């Protein structure tokens, strides 16, 4: 926006000064006084009271031009286009362009609307106020043009894992030039842009070099435009299609507890995922031929009635047009569980006592079974535990039997304790003393247990 005072008033003042200089002395004083009075009435640049504002509008929308007067004296207001053609003189429209419509006319404002703005309408528009001297102010209309077309192009519709591809995005015919941003999913990437100008319009092309991985399959690549004429997000996208070699995983589906023993059934399932999906999954035995009793059914490997000869490494292989992949499983067959005999009772009979000898059995069954990969160490530990338990049981039985024997002998000798005499002693001289001793012994018995004497 700018304002100016037309030079007609200054020219009049200058002409009056020249005339005063050429006049006679008496008249000269009067002319100078008149000149000073007239100069005080002439408006200067500081007294400019015509104003307007610049306008920015999006192509196809409506622009509003307003010529405003601060201190109106009912002077005429008119509006001119960039070619100095009169659009409105007061409330009259000489220009035959129906897109211009009068919104308001008064002594202090002339407001006009311009509909369906195009890039050709851009430029300076002039407001004029017919004062003495006339005043002029201009406004600039700037037209914003959003991108007419947004295109994204991928070098390859289908890429292979690890390959670098080129992605281009073009925003055509915008004003001013657009800013292009790249996203892969939610992650922003950096591209390289080139700007081409043609007839005050700009075409921007951005290039993105992208190395793809299998995780990028199905992820969108987004081209997003930022422009003052665009509200919200203007974007376009393409979904990546990435091919990758199979990923192989082996799962043991039987036995469920994870420990394989002789005589058990055994089953493995191979899972292979890739793009394109593997068409064939095969089983091989790495260190030997496949057992004859093994059954192969697609991704499943089944072996019935396991034995030690089945030990080895079994491999699942899968392939597609991208490549091959495999996974290994090491099988170790353990001995069958050891059967422990039930507890037994042994009875020994003597003359006066029955001795019962109990055999102590220690349970040697393992409380927890080892993992498949550590099964060999677990089996050796179980065998050692069985040997120690048997030895301990035998020692306990021997000690118990000896204790019982000592108790029996002690009780036997206690029952046969006493004084013994022979027949010869009975007829000897001291026999009377022996009888007396016996009588005294019988008469003086106070204990609960009877004391006896025997003569032989």
From Swiss-Prot:
Q: Which SUPFAM superfamilies match?
A: Immunoglobulin
- Which subcellular locations apply to this protein? Cell membrane; Synaptic cell membrane
Q: Name one GO molecular function term.
A: protein homodimerization activity
- Could you list the residue ranges that cross the membrane? 389-409
Positions on the Cytoplasmic side per record topology: 410-456
Q: Where are the Phosphoserine residues found in this chain?
A: 448
The record's annotation in PROSITE patterns points to: IG_LIKE
Tell me which residues bear Phosphothreonine. 436
Record-annotated Ig-like C2-type domain positions: 147-241, 246-332
Q: What is the superkingdom listed in this entry's lineage?
A: Eukaryota
Q: Which Gene3D superfamilies did the record assign? A: Immunoglobulins
Sequence ranges on the Extracellular membrane side: 48-388
- Any one Pfam family here would be C2-set_2
Q: Which UniProt keywords apply?
A: Apoptosis, Cell adhesion, Cell membrane, Developmental protein, Differentiation, Disulfide bond, Glycoprotein, Immunity, Immunoglobulin domain, Membrane, Phosphoprotein, Repeat, Signal, Spermatogenesis, Synapse, Transmembrane, Transmembrane helix, Tumor suppressor
Q: Which GO terms describe its cellular component?
A: axon; basolateral plasma membrane; cell body fiber; cell-cell junction; dendrite; glutamatergic synapse; plasma membrane; postsynaptic membrane
Gene disruption: observed consequences: Male mice are infertile, due to a defect at the spermatid stage of spermatogenesis, and show oligoasthenoteratozoospermia with almost no mature motile spermatozoa in the epididymis. Heterozygous males and females and homozygous null females are fertile and have no overt developmental defects. In the small intestine mucosa and under steady-state conditions, severe reduction in the number of intraepithelial CD4+ CD8+ T-cells and, partial reduction in the number of lamina propria and intraepithelial CD8+ and CD4+ T-cells.
Distribution of this protein across tissues and organs: Expressed dominantly in epithelial cells but not expressed in fibroblast cells (at protein level). Expressed in the T-cell area of lymph nodes, specifically in CD8+ and CD4- CD8- dendritic cells (at protein level). Expressed in CD8+ dendritic cells in the spleen (at protein level). Expressed in CD103+ dendritic cells in the small intestine lamina propria and mesenteric lymph nodes (at protein level). Expressed in brain, lung, kidney, testis, heart, spleen and liver, but not expressed in skeletal muscle.
Q: List the disulfide bonds.
A: 67-127, 169-223, 270-316
Q: What is one process in the GO biological process aspect for this record?
A: retrograde trans-synaptic signaling by trans-synaptic protein complex
Describe how it is modified after translation.
Answer: N-glycosylated. Glycosylation at Asn-70 and Asn-104 promotes adhesive binding and synapse induction.
- Which of this chain's residues carry glycans? 70, 104, 116, 168, 307, 311
Keyword Transferase tagged? no
Q: Which residues form the signal peptide?
A: 1-47
Q: What name appears for this protein in its UniProt entry? A: Cell adhesion molecule 1
Gene symbol here is Cadm1
